[in-house]
Amino acid sequence: MGCMCIAMAPRTLLLLIGCQLVFGFNEPLNIVSHLNDDWFLFGDSRSDCTYVENNGHPKLDWLDLDPKLCNSGRISAKSGNSLFRSFHFIDFYNYSGEGDQVIFYEGVNFSPSHGFKCLAYGDNKRWMGNKARFYARVYEKMAQYRSLSFVNVSYAYGGNAKPTSICKDKTLTLNNPTFISKESNYVDYYYESEANFTLQGCDEFIVPLCVFNGHSKGSSSDPANKYYTDSQSYYNMDTGVLYGFNSTLDVGNTVQNPGLDLTCRYLALTPGNYKAVSLEYLLSLPSKAICLRKPKSFMPVQVVDSRWNSTRQSDNMTAVACQLPYCFFRNTSADYSGGTHDVHHGDFHFRQLLSGLLYNVSCIAQQGAFVYNNVSSSWPAYGYGHCPTAANIGYMAPVCIYDPLPVILLGVLLGIAVLIIVFLMFYFMTDSGVRLHEA
């Protein structure tokens, strides 16, 4: 067979090259893109076309987003902000948007470089864990809903104590959840307190449920000067379902025993009437919620890694949060390196990654975006849209429904290849027999 290949090389070279082209065609691209015009992007300064500065830089040079998309109406972005930052802190931007295919390129504006801690001897790593859990919930839910926005949550508290701000660090002040001060008629924090709140107007709500995980010491107004173990819960008064957890760590808020900080879980709650209950220490309850509306057929979100140049410390919490099957993560292998604006804005590789938003593709999958829906040498994993060699892959089930056109095309190509090989074998065998007879 090897000798035959050598003899056939001039005639079979084109056939072999043709097969190579067919089976190396339509590779997945490392971009974020969309199947149609029903898409939306949540971002920060790298996609904020409204940001204004007067420092002599070229207009829009801070963008990773192509400026052609500035007037698309499909972008909600704010310089210096993020969904997580707006959710928890006074520094708020009213993110809102709707689409079938949702893309996130934000998160870096709350990172280890900010070093936020709730208390003087708190733990920023606890906040990185909060960030990961927050985005995991957001990504999971936005694979099932079209619309995301923020809403305020009002509450009714029967006591005399007022809200207090106990989580402040540098420029950030926490206001979600809200903490209720100790009632003046109690000498310590060993008492049960509660407040009612109502969630209405959305299909689901993402709210924080947080505790100070460790041993909290009472304030200077607490004569008992004791340590307390935080315990918080939300009770759905309509369904009877209780959500809650307690402090579990043996840490405090002192130089000798640091680490006490807020640990949050992010609940997806249905509309209804709720009661927030604290069995010890400070009562907390949500003041803001992410409003989820308009359920849709399952469509994974796409998340672009949001990080600084290596001169500033970043985290990988959006990558931790972005898990299959509800999320596809996109990144580059190089350090983020900005151009004319500064090192943190205008990276060439991230601009290439976001350039996929300029056009539609046929298929979005774990490996990337497939431009065409005919054939590919890479099988789309968790593919959505009209994917090469296969149509939609169902949720949680890697079983493909074959698209007949690519299969027929492959069959035709295979049939032609077999016929050509048989013809060439017959031709050379006949030619060899004639020459042998003449010899």
UniProtKB/Swiss-Prot annotation:
Result when mutating residue 281 to A: Decreased receptor-binding activity
Catalysis performed (reactions): N-acetyl-9-O-acetylneuraminate + H2O = N-acetylneuraminate + acetate + H(+); N-acetyl-4-O-acetylneuraminate + H2O = N-acetylneuraminate + acetate + H(+)
Residue ranges of the region described as Receptor binding: 133-281
Entry PTM: N-glycosylated in the host RER.
Active site, renumbered: 45, 342, 345
Keywords for the protein's UniProt record, in alphabetical order: Disulfide bond, Glycoprotein, Hemagglutinin, Host cell membrane, Host membrane, Hydrolase, Membrane, Signal, Transmembrane, Transmembrane helix, Viral envelope protein, Virion
Glycosylated position list: 94, 152, 196, 246, 309, 316, 331, 360, 374
Residues annotated as signal peptide: 1-22
Intravirion side: 429-439
Source species, domain of life: Viruses
Membrane-related topology note: Single-pass type I membrane protein
Quaternary structure annotation from Swiss-Prot or TrEMBL: Homodimer; disulfide-linked. Forms a complex with the M protein in the pre-Golgi. Associates then with S-M complex to form a ternary complex S-M-HE.
Entry protein name: Hemagglutinin-esterase
UniProt source species: Murine coronavirus (strain S) (MHV-S)
Upper lineage: Viruses, Riboviria, Orthornavirae, Pisuviricota, Pisoniviricetes
